[in-house]
């Protein structure tokens, strides 16, 4: 327990390894909404969040489970699903009159071509203004699912066409 004047107890979310408060402080000072991308074992979740004194407020959210409504038949946790979820998120954000955001990848490592950057690529291609470097985004072959179709052609089937048709269906939602 915290005994004595020199003992410091870190914040609970820091102790649990859930929040980097230094990075969070830098993102909040920017005074723009955050495009928060989180991965689970089964889904990709993208949210637009603003920080307020009472607590963070979610403005727009998109989950990769929603892709099934747009004709996507693949896994909801892979790179093409992240790309389509980012695109769906951008369409929802633009329809709700939120044209810009800054990327918040949380405790995920910033690795070239990662799923969080596939979601960023989908959002940027759909028209959301998010500052980024082009070199971090995954290649078009990966976001279309060509690497999956080449590895497992019997299971992936027509994944590339499925991703492209789902992307077209999502973009039709843009008002």
Curated annotation (Swiss-Prot):
GO biological process: ribosomal large subunit assembly; translation
Lineage, top ranks: Archaea, Methanobacteriati, Methanobacteriota, Stenosarchaea group, Methanomicrobia
GO cellular component, one term: cytosolic large ribosomal subunit
Source domain of life: Archaea
Organism of derivation: Methanosphaerula palustris (strain ATCC BAA-1556 / DSM 19958 / E1-9c)
Assembly notes: Part of the 50S ribosomal subunit. Contacts the 5S and 23S rRNAs.
Functional summary from the UniProt entry: This is one of the proteins that bind and probably mediate the attachment of the 5S RNA into the large ribosomal subunit, where it forms part of the central protuberance.
Keywords on record: Ribonucleoprotein, Ribosomal protein, RNA-binding, rRNA-binding
Full protein name: Large ribosomal subunit protein uL18
